[in-house]
A protein has these predicted regions:
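Hydrophobic alpha-helical segments involved in membrane association or supramolecular assembly
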Residues: 100, 491-499, 572, 617
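Basic- and hydrophobic-enriched, low-structure N-terminal and domain-boundary segments
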Residues: 1-214, 218, 223, 231, ...
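C-terminal nuclease/phosphodiesterase catalytic domains that cleave nucleic-acid phosphodiester bonds
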Residues: 616, 647-648
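Conserved ATP-driven motor cores of ASCE-family P-loop NTPases powering translocation/secretion/packaging/pilus
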Residues: 534-536, 540-543, 547-638, 724
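P-loop NTPase motor domains
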Residues: 25, 148, 152-156, 199-542, ...
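N-terminal structured subdomain of primase-like DNA metabolism proteins
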Residues: 28, 649-651
């Protein structure tokens, strides 16, 4: 306080000097020296001595004014006024300063223009000159003094804390043979800088979250399609709103095929259960995809869970019993049809001859394992085996038969028979309620899948391509289409395809072609055990990209445990604008976390203003900032690869500059070449039709004929099995 009083006294002295200089100016210029001839000439002598000073020496009034203004400036430099939060620079500085300077100029003009009118021996122009000088000095003093009331520390300047929450991001394009690189721009230290989002290890999985219209498909999904296609990946793309992504995928397939970038011999395939003209036919229920009972059980579980999507969790022990029973029963049916009268085929689909012997218990003929060429009779190794009715349509039709008929047929297979014990016991004891609980629910669900279109596409006679799309000998692109109006039914059928496809591509000991599996709108498709695929498929070069809108949506269809498995297994995380609380908290707290931020505090009292700077940990990107992102803005984090640790002398390390500790987080706006994208969209070509029908009526007739034929096949099979049983 003592120092403050001394300084205040010092400032008062300077203020006094300012106005003393004004009085001295009046003394020198406004008063006639002849009027000072009093007291023995003392005043005249003082006047003469002051006249010798530099600012008064040549009688130029301008120098005196300049000196006064300089004194005001020096005085105001040390002024400590109380700060004003609502500081108005125009009203408090500009206007009074301008007025004051104009009055000082006016005073000089008035001094040089003589007026005859006098007041108390002083000419009127001198009186006006003095008034203008005093008013001008006061206004200039007030204006410059008010500058000190301005809070220079930028209070309220960064209202939304943009500076503290901005950070330096990757500006270097990190590219390799598998990477996806997305150009972007980000704000940091007053500049909108250019940079790159480099997903250098896509095999660790990527998920993209964002509300509808946030730009997640345009910003992330489409670049993955574009760049992975150009880098020779086999592609599997799920198109919820066919043909939105289908046209893009086909365009890049044709483009890169011409440029020689797609794998050699790569074909383009689509699965579409609505417009079957645009669909290949595929049979996921056959021995090359289901080679044991465990695979049949997993296929059954996938199909049932996709039909019951969102209803898996929350049941008690009895619910779990009925769920497991339904899976076992469907698995028994699948495995029976896979093996029923199966025949060997070579790689070209040509039938071979399999030697058989009669089973002494069932009296059915079973393959011995020896396969011969039909032409030369030479022993050969078959490429695959195919059951006589090994497909999903025949299984769905078979499930509509009576319980007694089903049990009589299934128990003829020794491998399947053990699974039938609980069902046969319930049937023999006439516990029909229990049996309906075990099987009836399954039949209700699967009956929804029995459509003409599904029977056509899944029929064994139309197996157009292999689901191992990453096979170097027979690679392919696969577009899996859905329709919002039939989402649940088509989603279950697509889940069956995807389940068997994933099993195939996740083999090969690293010799496969890299494959990119892209599923936008993930909750509309049940992706069975997706966390295991992401966690184990890196060695087989399987890239998985998943898009959804928010975590509660994912939880509703996959359950809480399933959701946690997905979001915690994936390495690359990207988000557009989000709204759900769970999503925002996950991103803000677990992905971005907290960083050290400098917080500035200003304390204003009547005597002084204090500025405090504090360091504390706070959210790098708060939830409110993520929810407020505009379309095209994305944030997230990419997975790190191994980086060799570099140290200096004695193991020293500058951790702030070390490559190993640089952040891979980003908060930015995508920066695509829109002209190039529009040019690409203008070059899209029509999607191919794989089957041609003369008319819609002909298509319906062919599909219906196939539908009826499946039912007849099942009836014939049952009759044949029963005849063989009776022959025993």
């Amino acid at each position: 306080m003592e120092e403050s009083k001394e300084l205040q006294g010092f400032y008062k002295i300077f203020r006094t000097v300012v106005y003393v200089s004004v009085l001295l100016e009046f003394f020198e210029y406004a008063i006639d020296p002849a009027m000072l001839d009093h007291w023995g000439g003392i005043l005249t002598d003082i006047h003469g001595r002051i006249k010798q000073w530099m600012i008064y020496h040549d009688g130029n009034l301008v120098y005196s004014k300049i000196a006064t203004v300089l004194l005001i400036c020096i005085t105001c430099v040390g002024t400590r006024n109380k700060k004003h939060l609502e500081f108005n620079a125009r009203r408090q500085v500009v206007y009074p300063l301008t007025s004051g300077l104009l009055l000082l100029v006016l005073s000089v003009w008035l001094f040089g223009h003589t007026m005859e009118t006098r007041l108390y021996t002083l000419p009127l122009n001198i009186i006006l000159y003095m008034i203008a000088s005093i008013a001008g000095v006061v206004l200039v003093h007030i204006a410059l003094d008010n500058i000190s009331k301005f809070i220079k520390e930028g209070l309220m300047k960064d209202r939304f804390n943009f500076e503290n929450e901005s950070f330096e991001q990757c500006e270097e394009k990190v590219e390799n043979e598998y990477s996806v690189n997305i150009p972007m721009r980000y704000y940091y230290k007053g500049k909108f800088r250019k940079g790159w989002i480099s997903v250098s290890n896509c095999f660790r999985g990527t998920w993209v979250v964002g509300t509808p219209g946030s730009g997640k498909t345009f910003s992330i999904i489409e670049p993955f399609i574009r760049q992975h296609s150009a880098k020779g990946f086999a592609m599997v793309v799920y198109d919820y709103k066919f043909p939105t992504l289908a046209t893009k995928l086909y365009y890049h397939y044709k483009k890169n095929e011409k440029l020689g970038r797609v794998p050699q011999g790569c074909k383009f395939n689509m699965i579409n259960f609505v417009d079957v003209e645009y669909s290949r036919r595929v049979n996921p229920i056959q021995a090359k995809y289901i080679n044991n009972l465990a695979a049949a059980s997993e296929t059954a579980e996938t199909l049932l869970e996709s039909l019951q999507k969102g209803k898996k969790e929350g049941g008690g022990g009895s619910d779990q019993f009925f769920q497991t029973s339904a899976v076992n029963f469907l698995a028994a049916c699948i495995y029976f049809f896979v093996n029923y009268e199966r025949e060997p085929y070579d790689a070209n689909g040509k039938p071979l001859y399999a030697e058989r012997q009669q089973d002494p218990q069932t009296k059915f003929w079973k393959p011995t394992g020896i396969v011969r060429d039909r032409e030369g009779g030479n022993i050969v190794e078959p490429a695959y085996w195919l059951g006589k009715y090994s497909d999903m349509p025949h299984i769905l039709s078979f499930l509509n038969e009576s319980y007694q008929t089903i049990f009589e047929v299934l128990e003829t297979d020794n491998e399947v028979a053990p699974l039938l014990g609980p069902f046969q016991t319930a049937f023999k004891n006439k516990a029909m309620e229990q049996l309906e609980g075990m099987i009836g629910t399954l039949r209700v669900y699967t009956s929804r899948l029995a459509t003409k279109e599904s029977y056509w596409i899944f029929h064994r006679d139309g197996d157009d391509f292999d689901l191992k799309v990453s096979d170097p000998k027979n690679p392919s692109y696969l577009l899996i289409a859905n329709d919002p109006e039939m989402e649940s039914i088509i989603g279950a059928l697509n889940a069956l395809i995807l389940n068997r496809l994933v099993t195939r591509v996740n083999t090969g000991q690293g010799k496969n072609i890299p494959v990119s599996i892209i599923v936008d709108e993930l909750p509309t498709l049940y992706f069975h055990k997706i966390d295991r695929l992401i966690g184990t498929a890196r060695s087989n070069k399987v890239s998985v990209t998943l898009g959804f809108q928010n975590l509660p949506q994912l939880e509703a269809d996959y359950g809480k445990v399933g959701m946690q498995k997905i979001i915690t297994t994936v390495g690359n995380v990207v988000s557009g604008s989000a709204r759900a609380k769970e999503t925002l908290e996950w991103l803000s707290n677990d992905i971005f976390g907290k960083v050290v931020q400098v917080k500035k505090g200003v304390t204003i009292d009547r005597d002084k203003t204090s500025i405090n700077l504090n360091e504390n940990m706070d959210n790098l990107v708060p939830a409110s900032k993520i929810s407020d992102m505009a379309t095209g803005w994305i944030c997230g984090q990419t997975a790190r690869d191994f980086v060799k640790t570099k140290t200096g002398m004695g193991g020293s390390m500058n951790i702030q500059e070390s490559e190993e500790f640089k952040t891979t987080k980003f908060f930015c706006k995508t920066d695509f070449d829109m002209a190039e994208i529009k040019k690409e969209e203008a070059a899209y070509v029509p999607l191919p039709k794989f089957y041609t029908f003369k008319s819609r009526e002909e298509r319906e007739r062919i599909l219906y004929k196939n539908f009826v034929q499946v039912g007849q096949d099942v009836k014939e099979m049952i009759k044949d099995v029963q005849n063989k049983r009776n022959a025993k």
